[in-house]
Amino acid sequence: MSAQAELSREENVYMAKLAEQAERYEEMVEFMEKVAKTVDSEELTVEERNLLSVAYKNVIGARRASWRIISSIEQKEESRGNEDRVTLIKDYRGKIETELTKICDGILKLLESHLVPSSTAPESKVFYLKMKGDYYRYLAEFKTGAERKDAAENTMVAYKAAQDIALAELPPTHPIRLGLALNFSVFYYEILNSPDRACNLAKQAFDEAISELDTLSEESYKDSTLIMQLLRDNLTLWTSDISEDTAEEIREAPKRDSSEGQ
């Protein structure tokens, strides 16, 4: 569709909404990337920012789910000693990992070149730095060796930069600050294998938000309380020291991003 290149910013946003309704998330990503690349000197609107986030979360989410399922089957076949099947599964897993890498590289490049440099408001800075941390974390989920180490280090740098701004500039009940705490704590638990630090971060974020619950604005009440519930769910899970299946039940910021309505 050569006509797509000629669409205005507003038309690309509309097409992205259309693609979302049709659950055609790859195309939704394409439309929102065009919007993001046209705004070098100004920020995306909150609506545009959320559309971009939702598009990428759905595209990456489908592959992350596929990877987990295939990895689980691979472990079962390995334990049964089915080497031929394991070889087939490894190749198939590699295909999914190639897709995951391409998706993460795409959004990380966009964040580096356009979105982070053009952000001026504390809220959008935290949003994009959190997003940067999220996609490096997704790389760390399946990469190995030096690549995993690099992805984990980049995750930490991005989340830490986001946290510094969030703690200084956003209230404890702000959905973006809460969503950051949620995903940062998941990073500590899943990638760094630091359950104590994960629990401390999640508990502090939850407690600080609870103490200021009466200051919550009506429009962000639903988003904030949802993320607080997810923080509490993870704390319950992590502190009860459950079986190996724990990781699959861990909650992250929801697909409709933690900043919606802000």
Swiss-Prot record:
GO terms for biological process: protein localization; signal transduction. It is found in: Cytoplasm; Nucleus. Keywords: Cytoplasm, Nucleus. Disulfide bonds: none annotated. The keyword Mitochondrion does not apply. One of its GO terms (cellular component) is cytoplasm. It comes from the Eukaryota. Induction: By wounding, drought and salt stresses, benzothiadiazole (BTH), ethephon, hydrogen peroxide, abscisic acid (ABA) and incompatible and compatible races of rice blast fungus (M.grisea) and rice bacterial blight (X.oryzae). Expressed in seedlings and roots. Pfam families: 14-3-3. Gene3D superfamilies: 14-3-3 domain. Its main location: cytoplasm. InterPro entries: 14-3-3, 14-3-3_CS, 14-3-3_dom_sf, 14-3-3_domain. Belongs to the 14-3-3 family. May form a complex with the transcriptional activator VP1 and the bZIP transcription factor EMBP1. Is associated with a DNA binding complex that binds to the G box, a well-characterized cis-acting DNA regulatory element found in plant genes. This is 14-3-3-like protein GF14-B. It comes from Oryza sativa subsp. japonica (Rice). The gene is GF14B.
